[in-house]
């Protein structure tokens, strides 16, 4: 694909770590469900995920999901934490004539920036095996990315719905359905903050 030149609001290098409405789901379950996952890597990387869903009232389903990844990094100033939360709800009337669904999501990525190591020869010659003490170009720079949004969807069937599927001699199948009214509203806010307490550093 061709690469566009100029200002872009997209954060291409972080897109793989940012989740949005495509990652929201609306499970229909009739028993409370909870799932917890935890993993730790050999470099103290950690991953935690919690998923909870249940039917709170008849036909009212609520789901909550929290996901966080943490890495202390190998080099100086390379710590990273990526967290994601979303909640969704879904409700429809018993006759399915009216329904509403909605969701909220929030991404937060907090990254230390080091600008790379100062002297490439230390790496190429492997003169220092402890990467955590190798000098880097930036000592107090951070990247903060926040992406949050919510949405509401509603529908109303103009004609009542046939919810009785048992076809007896009194059942008459509707031949014409005049449709339904749909409403959709969505909002997303993007925030990207790069900060360095030493903006006059020779690195820039």
Residue locations for each model-derived region?
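Transmembrane beta-barrel strands of outer-membrane/channel proteins
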Residues: 36-40, 66-68, 102-106, 181-189
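Extracytoplasmic loops and strand-loop junctions of Gram-negative outer membrane beta-barrel proteins
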Residues: 17-18, 33-35, 69-72, 130-140, ...
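Residues on the lipid-exposed face of transmembrane beta-strands in outer-membrane beta-barrel proteins
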Residues: 50-54, 87-91, 150-158
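Strand-connecting loop/turn motifs
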Residues: 31, 57-59, 93-97, 176-178
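Outer-membrane beta-barrel translocator/receptor signature
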Residues: 14-21, 26-85
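Repeated loop/turn-to-beta-strand initiation elements of outer-membrane beta-barrel proteins
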Residues: 59-62, 95-100, 161-163
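Face-selective signature of the C-terminal outer-membrane beta-barrel domain
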Residues: 133-204
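Outer-membrane beta-barrel translocator/channel fold
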Residues: 7, 72-148
